[in-house]
Amino acid sequence: MKSNWNYPTTMWVGKDRIKDLSNACKTLNINKPLLVTDNGLAKSQIVIDVLNNLKENGILVELYSNVIGNPTGTNVTEGADYYNKNSCDGVIAFGGGSGLDVGKAIAFMSGQTLPIWDFEDVGDNWTKADSQKIAPIIAVPTTAGTGSEAGRASVILNEETGVKNIIFHPKFLPSIVILDPVLTVGLPPKITAATGMDALAHNLEAYCAPGYHPMADGIALEGMRIINDWLLEAVNNGSNVEARQNMLTAASMGSTAFQKGLGAIHSLSHPVNALNNIHHGLSNAIFMPYVLTFNKDVIEKKIIKICDYLELNDCSFDGFINWILDLRKKLDMPHKLSEVIDEKDFDLDRLSKMALADPSTGGNPKKLTEADMKIMYQHSMSGKLFK
């Protein structure tokens, strides 16, 4: 299944393509990359082998491994300082969504003078950047979920405000992506499931977002079909390289498709990820049926089209909801937010305000108010779907 793609960027796909990483560096004239990853991966044999292979091929790689889950502005600033201190000339963003997001943001911020928050994805903020001082990026995902390797943004937590900000620039899109399923074979079932549901949320919300974008719609539909065919297999048989390859592909497709927009699944998720430190894929999985049933009157026709494309037994809105609920059950995922967040730690008013202000809110099929966010949170906590 090895192949080379040129959309949405250069993507080298297939088993053992990680061995081409030094060639990717040479293709981009990167002689001294900074490999950005988390501390756990940095100690793994995968990263040890990658670093050795790069050095054997004359690439003078440096390592930054302080990335944390739900990464912060401090992560980015520290990494950018390390990049400049060591005179690096490119970034290898290596890992799950956090490693990829921080790596991309380090490449971006290494040459900027304004603070990172000035580049939040609002209006034309991205035009404030000096685009000539953005380092080249190679992305190597080790999970199949965020699709950050195919995206033009990073999600970074502002520690002062407690808000997860989407930082955007067209040059966040990596120049080369390596999709090697072997790197995801060791993922535990729970992480495989959560990241897979993140990929589903991306494809699903992109398809349901309003606006005319047949290209994104087509990619999103096929992404959902791949997830339907392969997610359970990837979870139940993690050594199945074909399943892992397909899930990596579906994740990249989701990120490509959501250029069209996202929606309330993500709007509700980002605040609980920031304030309650809940895994993003897990929160997306929890919120999914509540948001879908809330939006039912404006998305029902689209949902039926998805059912038809996925060849579900029950091609109706309720049939699709039952498919989601059944999938979550098979993945051993919670039905209610209260199963992962204690009521005393749940600041409904603050979360609702943050959700409404989230950039993803604009892509929701139905215009939303703070009261809408509040009631969706309440239903998610109680486990009661909207009728």
Description of each model-found segment:
Residues 303, 307, 311-387:
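C-terminal charged capping/lid subdomain of soluble metabolic enzymes
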Residues 152-260, 371:
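Carboxylate- and glycine-rich phosphate/diphosphate-binding segment that chelates Mg2+/Mn2+
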Residues 74-179:
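Glycine/threonine-rich beta-strand-loop-alpha-helix active-site module
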Residues 1-64, 385-387:
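An N-terminal, well-structured beta->alpha segment
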Residues 10, 32-34, 61-62, 89-92, ...:
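Structural motif
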Residues 262-319:
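C-terminal catalytic subdomain
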Residues 42-115, 233-244:
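N-terminal small/polar loop signature for handling phosphorylated ligands or for N-terminal nucleophile
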